Amino acid sequence: MMKKPVVIGLAVVVLAAVVAGGYWWYQSRQDNGLTLYGNVDIRTVNLSFRVGGRVESLAVDEGDAIKAGQVLGELDHKPYEIALMQAKAGVSVAQAQYDLMLAGYRDEEIAQAAAAVKQAQAAYDYAQNFYNRQQGLWKSRTISANDLENARSSRDQAQATLKSAQDKLRQYRSGNREQDIAQAKASLEQAQAQLAQAELNLQDSTLIAPSDGTLLTRAVEPGTVLNEGGTVFTVSLTRPVWVRAYVDERNLDQAQPGRKVLLYTDGRPNKPYHGQIGFVSPTAEFTPKTVETPDLRTDLVYRLRIVVTDADDALRQGMPVTVQFGDEAGHE
């Protein structure tokens, strides 16, 4: 009879130990937080001129640090300077033509057109009278049919000249047609667009660094004739520094955008970098081969981009990084 209470007591002790152990294990997981493994993202860009031409000079070499806005190289500017001058001249011509269309015709031009009408009218009247006389002579068989035809032809030519002079005077007095003005305006806008393109081409004959980085390769040398878009430099971008890591679905709720994390490298295991999750992929993917966590290699995972907020030159691209979640990392 005494054994039963003893057994019950032992069971209670064992159960309490299990509960305590489970609680301790749970707390230890909460305290340690989630640990992920990733790498510093490799970010490179190929730099090229947007226009073609002969390379005039290159200002940097492999291994050089470059700054955003720095001049890296130049093409021969002369062809683009000439094209710019031609485009400016084209705008001047088109502007002058458009201004003439808007202004209409001068009084002197209208007076000259009116005088031309009078002169053409007189010539037509003479040709008509001459033709009438020739008709009478032909009826009396005094002249040949060929003479009559010549008189008719002269009359018709004088009539056409008169009509042309009258149309010209009418146009001068009414001004230019709206269609002609619109065409002149379109020609001006086209010339202005060509000028803008020429200015852009000249600007693009100088290669400017888009951001800070380190020059990895220099693909050409001065004197090389390049097509537009031909690679000149390959640059490793140094800012901002991103870490790429992967998280499985059951831990996805801990890896939300804005979450702060600690980043450890082998070179400084006791002095972590600080980072913040900037992006979480909306779609799952099979774990890449580069992921070093064995229990994730066969899982579907979500890619994270972590922005390092206190990066320095010791954090190199491709370097393995341990990502630590926990209370010490904090939240946004």
UniProtKB/Swiss-Prot annotation:
Keywords: Coiled coil, Periplasm, Signal
Segments forming a coiled coil: 108-209
Keyword Coiled coil among UniProt keywords: yes
Compartment(s) of residence: Periplasm
Classification via Pfam families: HlyD_D23
Cross-referenced Gene3D superfamilies: 2.40.30.170, 2.40.50.100, Helix hairpin bin (1.10.287.470)
Signal peptide limits: 1-16
Keyword Oxidoreductase: no
Gene Ontology cellular-component annotations: periplasmic space
NCBIfam families assigned: PRK03598.1
Family recorded in the similarity comment: Belongs to the UPF0194 family.
Name listed for the protein in its UniProt record: UPF0194 membrane protein YbhG
Originating organism: Escherichia coli O1:K1 / APEC
